């Protein structure tokens, strides 16, 4: 119930459902960007998120404030972001208290962040997540098996890549990739 601040959290090692208790339930995401190798939520087993708001509060970095940046890393465990998830963050550059608020990139990663995973990935998204980059594979990490990415009834997602993203090291998928879009 209410608001819970999420800086860095590793989910329990059992299948977990994170469900808001009422309309005021919010996850207050601190600034964590995959490009910095940082995450807000890292899975240690299957996770379903439902009936909660992703609220990306700002962090003041000298002259800019960054809104809308969170990173969820599934590490190959099943991740479901259900239709009851809503978002609250700016989607355009805004000025608050005379400072520019830059929109930032959010990430949902099926594989690992700067790590290879030995299994496959399974990510399902049933809601709009503007400004979000969705990777079925890893970011700077390979996936040794199959990738499954299902996106349904999601009015808007910034960028979808069924495989991975390689910047510092390989991000290969050594299996089949299944990408389902249903709108």
Where are these regions (language model features)?
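Detector for repetitive beta-architecture
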Residues: 3, 15-17, 26, 40, ...
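Short, surface-exposed polybasic-and-hydrophobic patches located at secondary-structure transitions
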Residues: 61-75
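Right-handed parallel beta-helix/beta-spiral solenoid domain characteristic of secreted/periplasmic
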Residues: 12-58, 89, 100
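Short glycine/acidic-rich loop motifs that flank beta-strands on beta-rich extracellular proteins
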Residues: 32-38, 57-63, 90-95, 113-118, ...
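Short, surface-exposed loop/strand segments
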Residues: 2-8
